[in-house]
């Protein structure tokens, strides 16, 4: 299914009981709903637990439109896509699960429209991370030299998905996505669960991030990196317990 978000066509999916508590799932950079949440059995886990899953393909990804202008990927714009999706579905408030880029979008959602999101699970996020290497990643995606391990990780991941538009992904990584604002984080009142693998070398300064987010609880998954943390059973267990608290 598709909807219009201020002139950009975005794809979404609905799964699970119609009367279940709604939860929006937002994937990471160069991924999409199917890759991030279906193959990893998150959709199955949440729907079996009675949740109404709303899966979004972010702009630039999956089956959604793929603009080539970095300005189209400002964090506020990508968060507004989530708000418009809730409006399209006539949902006043929904829980939220986001990973990596999707976690940054969820963070922005709590700043911009906190009453539209309930309990929020943020995975694979810290104070900085891959977006600090945006220029290197974009250069690699555009066929230039690979100048860092982070750029190689994201280039290999992006190239591995035939549906990816590498120019759109380069625009996305170059979009206006500043580091968290400590004053804005301090005002967040939504309950937040942060989940990070202890071998994640993509995110940075997780402890600093948690210190500035007073409502957050941190769960660290042993032996998992940025990619392998997503399907971890410990991640699913912690998220379900948090969502159903």
Where are these regions (language model features)?
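Catalytic histidine-centered segment of alpha/beta-hydrolase-like enzymes
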Residues: 224-236
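Active-site loop/oxyanion-hole signature of alpha/beta-hydrolase fold enzymes
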Residues: 38, 44-48, 55-95
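Short alpha-helix in the alpha/beta-hydrolase fold that links the catalytic acid
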Residues: 39, 190, 203-211
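Catalytic histidine neighborhood in serine/cysteine hydrolases
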Residues: 210-227
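Conserved hydrolase catalytic core segment
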Residues: 92-130
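Short beta-strand/loop motif that positions the catalytic acidic residue
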Residues: 188, 194-196
